[in-house]
Amino acid sequence: MTEKTIVFKVGTSSLTQENGSLDRIKIARITNQLAQLHQKGYQIVLVTSGSIAAGFRRLGFDKRPTKIAEKQASAAVGQGLLIEEYTQNLMKDGIVSAQILLTQDDFADARRYQNASQALQVLLKQRAIPIINENDTIAIEEIKVGDNDTLSAQVASLLKADLLVLLTDVDGLYTANPNSDPTAQHLPQIKEITEDLFAMAAGAGSSNGTGGMTTKLQAAQIATKSGVPVFICSSKEDTALLQAVTQANRGTLFLADDHAMNQRKQWMAFYARTDAAVEVDAGAVDAMLHQGRSLLATGVKALEGDFEVGQVVEVYSQADHRLIGKGRVKLSSKDLQDQLANGRAEGVLIHRNDWVSL
């Protein structure tokens, strides 16, 4: 028996028929595999799209809506239908499921972030399968960008999962879009996610979903930097989920970073709300990135936005305007501005223990 934690993300295209509506056969196939893995001792979390697909026809629309308000309304109807489908299927195998709706705010707020972590840990300990979705009825931006890829990475990182599996309608990452370029080559393993990878990623997904390969790369970047390996594969095979656990099927495996961030630094890097920024000189960049030092107020050359003590701000290199990291500040923007204006900037702005390089 194993107690490994696996987070599966299933996209809309893996759950729907050609007309965009929910496919019960596909859902049954997924839940059957989840049940088999559950019985083997795996701790399973499912991050699922599909609430809009489940609800738009019940609401009277002939095809999947494109307007934000209509999507929100469809999601409000469909979320209950979607979770009911999962719940009934899992109950056939005696498995309890739990619905959790999240938004980015649940990760941006440190207390809610911890609460979400604790609730998920209890559910897994009690052998339930959490079924998680973006709260599409209120999360406007998430509906626009199909951010359940990112959500699944955040959940996997939060739980320190052993593997994140992103199921989609393609069998991994290619050097070009395989649907339009016959020379596209499949990439079975990725050690480091670079800008070149983002450049080659095909950005368009299927019309039923809202996320393409670019969002999956962004998700993989979050997870791998948090110490969680990621496997992207197709959901079309009947046993895709079962095979994905050991990467027996064709896909792309993203290896976990050797120097994974701890949970506190993960929160600063990926989730904390940042409404302000500072620009620092070359000496400060070198001290923070290469010498492990704190950011002194003397290194700050410009600031943007207002911040109070304890808030997380972005830090940019003045030379090339590159984002180099984020950190909690020990001075307010007002105090820092006053110091800079009087030519007497002093003390630590961001301590190295409250800093994460990006």
UniProtKB/Swiss-Prot annotation:
It catalyses: L-glutamate + ATP = L-glutamyl 5-phosphate + ADP. The keyword S-adenosyl-L-methionine does not apply. It holds the Pfam family AA_kinase. ATP binds at K9, T168, D169, T210, G211, G212, M213, T214, T215, K216. InterPro entries: AceGlu_kinase-like_sf, Asp/Glu/Uridylate_kinase, G5K_ProB, Glu/AcGlu_kinase, Glu_5kinase, Glu_5kinase/COase_Synthase, Glutamate_5-kinase_CS, PUA. Substrate binds at S49, D136, N148. CDD domains: AAK_G5K_ProB, PUA_G5K. It is found in: Cytoplasm. Residues 275-353 form the PUA domain. Belongs to the glutamate 5-kinase family. Catalyzes the transfer of a phosphate group to glutamate to form L-glutamate 5-phosphate. This is Glutamate 5-kinase. It comes from Streptococcus suis (strain 05ZYH33). The gene is proB.
